[in-house]
């Protein structure tokens, strides 16, 4: 196990097949045409995962961040589940597909500059901050805001948006499509639209 004073960097240009890996103080950079395939990856103690344009990461179980860790995705990222703990960040610059849930309820943050597609639930909490950039999209079945801060300049589409009764805020400057909205806290509509469904 590494310590913060001797942090290492791993560059992946080929394919890394992994089963179950927990990494401390490690920067993983997946270069163009590089791939990570496996089941489970945990990043902790300021570790980072950077996926460059043209690179892929595919995990059949989950990707977990713990203790100031960061995921920067400019390629293609696919996992069944993702967990972001306190002060962890998902920076999505291209395409992230999560086939089950994204749990940031311990204070993880999401900065979306691409397409983030979660088949089931995005869970947030009071310390969480979500930013969806112009011409970008976040899609999920259920969005549990639970007191978080949400800023939307792109498109967000959910079956259910639930503020969780914990306050929080939603600043919408573009498009929010939601069938069932349980609003609470502050909802600020600025030159945008909140509608039940998107017109074809």
Q: Where are the language model's segments positioned?
A:
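Extracellular beta-strand-rich, repetitive "passenger/adhesive" scaffolds
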Residues: 1-200
């Amino acid at each position: 196990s590494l310590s913060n004073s001797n942090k290492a960097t791993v560059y992946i240009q080929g394919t890394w097949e992994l089963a179950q890996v927990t990494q401390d103080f490690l920067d993983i950079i997946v270069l163009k045409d590089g791939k990570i395939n496996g089941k489970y990856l945990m990043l902790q103690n300021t570790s980072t995962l950077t996926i460059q344009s043209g690179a892929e990461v595919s995990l059949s179980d989950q990707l977990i961040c713990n203790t100031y860790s960061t995921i920067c995705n400019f390629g293609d990222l696919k996992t069944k589940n993702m967990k972001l703990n306190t002060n962890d960040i998902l920076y999505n610059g291209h395409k992230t597909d999560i086939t089950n849930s994204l749990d940031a309820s311990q204070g993880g943050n999401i900065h979306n500059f691409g397409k983030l597609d979660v088949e089931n639930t995005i869970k947030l909490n009071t310390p969480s901050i979500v930013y969806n950039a112009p011409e970008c999209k976040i899609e999920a079945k259920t969005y549990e805001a639970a007191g978080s801060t949400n800023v939307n300049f792109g498109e967000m589409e959910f079956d259910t948006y639930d503020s969780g009764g914990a306050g929080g805020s939603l600043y919408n400057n573009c498009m929010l499509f939601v069938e069932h909205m349980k609003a609470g806290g502050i909802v600020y509509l600025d030159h945008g639209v909140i509608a039940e469904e998107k017109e074809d």
